[in-house]
C-alpha cells in the first residue's frame, strides 16, 4: 500500500510490517527537535526516519535487515524532501552498532520493535521477521541502544503492554533507565494496549507516567491525538 502524509509519501508494499498507528504515534511523540544524529533501528519502510527528518534538522541513519524492506526504505527516502539528510544501512543492527563510528554517536534512537513474542508466525518470511522478537530480542536491542546512544541521548520505543514487564526486566540488566512512559489506549474507557517509552543513560527520579487516548467513545480522534499527529495526517 501507499500512504501520503502532509510532507512525504510512504510506499510499504514489500515491507513485512505496513505503516501503522503505532509507528505514527511513536514518530510524533519522540522528543526529536534538538537531535543532531538519529538512528532508526528496524526501519522498515522508513516511516520513523522520515518523521524524524520532518521534525528535526538532524542526520538520519536507518538500519534495516530485511532486503525488500530496505529497498522500500531507500526508495521512500530518495523521494522525500530530506534525501540528503537520510541514509540507509542494509544490515544487522548488532553488527552495525559495533562499528567504531557509531559507538556513542547518536543522540536519539527510535525503534518500533518486533512485537509478536508467541503464537503462529506470519507465512511470509519478511513479514515474520518484522513481527517476531526472535529476529531482534529485547536484550540484543537494548545492548545495541547502549552501544550507539550518546551519554546525553535518548531512545524512544513503543511496545505492547503485555511485553512491558519482560522488557523492563531486560532493562534492569543494562545501564539504561526509563525516564518517561505513556500508556496508550486505542479507545476511551478501554484498557491501555501500548506503551511509549523514553530511555536514557541518566536516571531521573521519579520518572514520568502519563496516558494517551487515540479515539473517544464516538470513534473520532481525541484532542490529544489530533494535537500529536496534526503535522502528519492529511485530514487533521
Swiss-Prot record:
Reactions the enzyme catalyzes: adenosine(37) in tRNA1(Val) + S-adenosyl-L-methionine = N(6)-methyladenosine(37) in tRNA1(Val) + S-adenosyl-L-homocysteine + H(+)
GO biological-process terms attached to the record: methylation; tRNA processing
GO CC list: cytoplasm
Compartments reported by the entry: Cytoplasm
Disulfide bonds: none
UniProt keyword annotation of Hydrolase present: no
EC nos: 2.1.1.223
One Pfam family named in its UniProt record: MTS
Cited SUPFAM superfamilies: S-adenosyl-L-methionine-dependent methyltransferases
Superkingdom: Bacteria
Biological role: Specifically methylates the adenine in position 37 of tRNA(1)(Val) (anticodon cmo5UAC).
Entry similarity comment: Belongs to the methyltransferase superfamily. tRNA (adenine-N(6)-)-methyltransferase family.
Record's protein name: tRNA1(Val) (adenine(37)-N6)-methyltransferase
Naturally occurring in which organism (per UniProt): Shewanella sp. (strain MR-7)
Lineage: Bacteria, Pseudomonadati, Pseudomonadota, Gammaproteobacteria, Alteromonadales
